[in-house]
């Protein structure tokens, strides 16, 4: 009887599966350094689901300034004495990490951001789109550097017809009484610019033609070939756009002989060139 009592029951070795129990998580290390994690869970329908995940561990090395690393290892003092290293959330608020990316065209980006923000830009930014325009030939250069400043008057400016009368009136208005003293700078002829050395007599034989309605595809060499049939051409100026480098629609042709210029003006006025009709006339002379 004692032998039967000490004998183990066969029912104790029987294992009963618990339907609510899940198998343990299995972690397997692969040869390529990754890990495969197998776990089980119940879905919304109460069914057992097997989940397999493959995890790859990446080590990121950060190079820190040695002085910065040394300061981080300092022991805290004062009210923070004895606390763990690093910022404490009850005394330190960590702001957003702003990534600084240097850019080559940072000036253009800053100007665009300023423009979008509605702020008034600098005077340089306001004038950067302005173009220089000559008052004589309407070209994109300063009037003082115009090659025709000595041979023609500004565009759309009337010639000096009553200039002498205006000078006489201005001079007479100062000293109306007989014998009254008139300062040198207010005397007749002093208000206008002085005569250039040999200016009027030197430029008498120079003839310049103004050619308008010129095609955008015109070239200075082509214009020179067209007008050199009537005489020697000393200078050809074709106004071009600074950005597109195309002709702006007008040009100036200077001849050595005025008779050749007159013949060219008569023959070339109304001449068809690149599907356009040229308008040729004598350029206005400066006074």
Curated annotation (Swiss-Prot):
Keyword Protein biosynthesis set for record: yes
UniProt key word Protease: no
Boundaries of every RRM domain copy: 207-285
Listed GO CC annotations: eukaryotic 43S preinitiation complex; eukaryotic 48S preinitiation complex; eukaryotic translation initiation factor 3 complex, eIF3e; eukaryotic translation initiation factor 3 complex, eIF3m; multi-eIF complex
GO molecular function terms listed in the Swiss-Prot or TrEMBL record: RNA binding; translation initiation factor activity
Highest taxon in the source lineage: Eukaryota
Biological process per Gene Ontology, one example term: translational termination
InterPro entries in the cross-refs: eIF3_g (IPR017334), eIF3g_N (IPR024675), eIF3G_RRM (IPR034240), Nucleotide-bd_a/b_plait_sf (IPR012677), RBD_domain_sf (IPR035979), RRM_dom (IPR000504)
Name of protein: Eukaryotic translation initiation factor 3 subunit G
The organism's taxonomic lineage, starting at the top: Eukaryota, Fungi, Dikarya, Ascomycota, Pezizomycotina
């Amino acid at each position: 009887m004692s032998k039967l009592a000490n004998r183990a029951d066969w029912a104790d070795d029987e294992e009963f599966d618990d339907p609510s129990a899940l198998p343990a998580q299995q972690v397997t290390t692969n040869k390529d350094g990754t890990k495969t994690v197998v776990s089980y869970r119940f879905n919304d329908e109460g069914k057992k689901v097997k989940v397999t995940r493959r995890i790859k561990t990446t080590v990121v090395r950060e190079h820190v300034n040695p002085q910065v690393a040394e300061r981080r290892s300092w022991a805290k003092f004062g009210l923070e004495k004895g606390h763990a290293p690093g910022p404490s959330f009850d005394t330190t608020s960590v702001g957003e990490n702003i990534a600084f990316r240097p850019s080559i065209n940072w000036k253009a980006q800053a100007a665009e951001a300023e423009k979008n923000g509605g702020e008034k830009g600098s005077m340089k930014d306001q004038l950067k789109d302005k173009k220089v325009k000559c008052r004589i030939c309407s070209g994109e250069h300063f009037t003082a550097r115009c090659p025709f400043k000595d041979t023609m008057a500004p565009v759309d400016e009337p010639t000096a017809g009553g200039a002498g009368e205006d000078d006489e009136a201005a001079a007479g208005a100062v000293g109306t009484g007989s014998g009254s003293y008139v300062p040198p700078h207010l005397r007749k002829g002093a208000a206008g610019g002085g005569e250039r050395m040999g200016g009027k007599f030197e430029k008498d034989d120079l003839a310049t033609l103004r050619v308008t309605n010129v095609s955008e595809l015109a070239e200075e060499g082509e214009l020179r070939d067209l007008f050199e049939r009537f005489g020697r051409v000393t200078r050809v100026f074709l106004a071009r756009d600074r950005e597109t480098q195309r002709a702006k629609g007008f040009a100036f042709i200077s001849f050595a002989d005025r008779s050749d210029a007159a013949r060219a003006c008569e023959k070339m006025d109304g001449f068809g060139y690149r599907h356009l009709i040229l308008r040729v006339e004598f350029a206005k002379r400066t006074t």
